[in-house]
Amino acid sequence: MSAACGCDEPTTSPADEADEAERPWWRDPGLVVPILSGVAFGTGLALEWSGLHIAALVAFWAGLLLGAYTFVPGAIRNLVVKRKLGIALLMTISAVGAVILGYVEEAAALAFLYSIAEALEDKAMDRARGGLRALLKLVPETATVLRDGTSASVPAREIAVGDVLLVRPGERVATDGLVRSGRSSLDTSAITGESIPVEVAPGEAVSAGAINSAGVLEVEATAAGTDNSLTTIVELVEQAQAEKGDRARIADRIARPLVPGVMVLAVLVGVLGSLLGDPETWITRALVVLVAASPCALAIAVPVTVVSAIGAATKFGVVIKSGAAFERLGGIRHLAVDKTGTLTRNRPEVTAIVAAHGFDDAQVLAWAAAVEQHSTHPLAAAIAAAGRGTPAAQDVAEEAGHGIGGLVDGRRVAVGSPRWIDAGPLKARVEDLEAEGQTCVLVTVDGFLAGAIGVRDELRPEVPEVVRTLRDQGVEVSMLTGDNSRTAAALAKLAGIGDVYAELRPEDKARIVAGFSETSPTAMIGDGINDAPALAGATVGIAMGATGSDAAIESADVAFTGHDLGLIPQALRHARRGGRIINQNIVLSLAIITVLLPLAITGVLGLAAVVLVHEVAEVVVIANGLRAARARKQ
């Protein structure tokens, strides 16, 4: 909520909000008290119409006190303790002034309408955070842990790294881990937005919140029950809801000075009007001005939309880290895409081994696999998986964009691209493999060329359609890769991408993306260590979250929990729609003030009428903002 509201900021956690949201409305004092205020006010109107004026006055006072209870204490506390002038203070002054002038009925109307509008605003924000609460509910309350040969049910929050979990069919995985025994398929649709079940076997990773669809699994926890991938997503979304974008800051820049400005204007109207006319009339109009020009709707215009949109994005597998990133995402006109693991299926396989003279294929593969098992690069995983009986490697160091090296059985082994290691007598064979669309790495042992390994990673089937959709959205697509130009060109042709940059180091990618960003808003999407500098330098950095490296995820503004590149145009559509709703809300909020202010000064509308129009406008703005939560994976 905007600071301009002058209301107490909520301090509850998402878990607390989840509990509060599940309470029936009649047990929520934030809603019951305004309703009782309305009942008392309505009763007062009925009694007054019946001619029972004293009873009506009592009912109006009851409605006034009940409604005022919801905002007056907070307004005074903010003024005295925090030295903040808020909208609630304007309403308090108006209500007190109306009572002093003898307009108890109008004061009761103000208290009721403002309190019910604030209650609806709080409920709207709770609803907007519904996606976050849904994520929290994906983790089961208890989990079965195997200890000393027996199983025991323990609270999920007490799970520690190294615990072995027994996950039966139909149960959710309580925290991140590795399958120790068993095979099954997992439903991860609630986390990643992908409907196709994921097959898992021993040694493969599973995520918190996934549903075990088939066999019994034993899973060794790699994260504590309170610190896993789901809690990380929740923390990111919490931060996103707190951080403001340009339009949110514009709304605040207007709303904050508007509150004291309104107070000054009201004083001027009251003083100058009293000098020129009837003091009671002009003081009454001054009180109406306090309400007419208060930026209630403006204060909530952006937050409710951003919170709704960011929460909705998590439902289809997109985690947006800040309100600023959400707003920038809607303006993207250029997309730079990493090739390996992003455009490709991320299931590379070793397709060729060429040993140099004096070495054999098995030796070359074993040496390469020994060091590559320490790398996060998708191609490294293919080489590590292909090597059987892999020896241990020590003193391993990875140089992003070049390769990796280490000691294997006392020998210095290096694995890297042909740009880092000279192919020598294997150059012609390496070029042939690259022309076939394979990516080649070279292996040296103690400085001598041992061989070359060809790896192929197929293009994701959805890529051509995604590229066409992005073009239809007015987004230009460029491919960036550290791979050789021949392999890159072959894959780009299949993808329908005409703008290709190959044989790039991490610093080259960062430089190119920075150049793109200078001419048009640019997003960069990738998932590896070598993508991190480019992600950080883009207008919006997007990380493929499920398999991405920590460096890439930390550098990005947006993370995909799944692998479907169709999320890119969906995320852009979602952000653009949210941006349009934000603009609509800001324009509507300012229009209400512009229209009501002269009507208040000239006395056309009284206090009750202005309050009614103002609060109805706020409800309209809230309802419009909640439209941003209507997102579906397409």
Q: What positions do the PLM features span?
A:
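Actuator/coupling domain of P-type ATPases
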Residues: A3, P10-W25, G44-L45, F60-T142, ...
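Bilayer-spanning, highly hydrophobic alpha-helical transmembrane segments
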Residues: G38-V39, R249-G277, R285-S294, P303, ...
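Membrane-embedded alpha-helical bundles of multi-pass transporters
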Residues: A46-L47, G74-V80, I93-L101, A312, ...
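Small-residue-enriched core segments of transmembrane alpha-helices in multipass membrane transport
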Residues: W61-L64, S115, P257, I283-A301, ...
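Conserved catalytic phosphorylation-site environment of P-type ATPases
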Residues: V81, T92, R127-L132, E141, ...
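Conserved cytosolic catalytic loops of P-type ATPases
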Residues: A134-D227, A324-A368, L407-V408, T519
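P-type ATPase nucleotide-binding
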Residues: E349-E476, S485, L494-V513
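Conserved ATP-binding TGD loop and adjacent catalytic N/P-domain core of P-type ATPases
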Residues: G410, T439-Q584, I622
